[in-house]
Amino acid sequence: MNLKTLVFHHDDRSTDFLKPIYAGLPPATVVTNSRHQNMGELISQHDRVIMLGHGYPGGLFFMVDGSHAALLRQKRDNLYIWCHADAYVKHHGLTGLTTGMFISETAEAKFSGIPANTYSQFTVTHSNDLFARLVAEKIHAPLPELHAHLLDHYQPKGCPIIEYNRKRIQLIEPVAASAKRTQTTATLHP
């Protein structure tokens, strides 16, 4: 797969572990600071968009929000990797590989109800590094293959962080997204 790729990854030390995901791509446009950038124009100029970092159901902090959904809907093989990205993808009827709540820091583990005696900074770092390495290994593959690779190899083996995160990795394919758009349209126009 040789797509013109755009990467949104806000410059943030706490998400540097995600850099290997796009380090091996052919020249990609990497945006780490959205100031003075026309995000919509950048999205329009690329075949796929990889979005990484911290976020919420409304988007990727400092980079992507609801105003970008129509443009993202025209792209293929997008990756949405931030906390609650799945809610953003589903709400806007998008497709791609996405994560739900994704623990990448010890505070997030505590917030997510993981018992404190079952993890450490080491286990969180191990989970982060393994996830990024596995995504990087199949970044050129079709999304169903990347998704299967993650499910096959991002295994808990006693790590509650990986167990939690693994359950929240989803591949949202065009059929499901199309049904969501139809459902939304029906709701808006009874």
Enumerate the language-model features and the residues they cover:
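A domain-level signal for caspase-like cysteine endopeptidase catalytic cores
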Residues: 1-50, 79-80
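Active-site-proximal beta-strand/loop segments in catalytic clefts of secreted hydrolases
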Residues: 9-11, 52-54, 81-85, 99-101
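A short acidic (Asp/Glu
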Residues: 15-20, 59-63, 89-93, 107-109
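A generic structural signal for alpha->beta connector loops
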Residues: 25-27, 75, 93
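A generic local structural motif
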Residues: 35-38, 64-69, 82
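A short, glycine/acidic-enriched catalytic loop
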Residues: 55-74
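Helix-loop-strand module that forms the ligand-binding subsite of alpha/beta enzymes
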Residues: 68-88
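Active-site-proximal C-terminal subdomain of hydrolase catalytic domains
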Residues: 78, 86-190
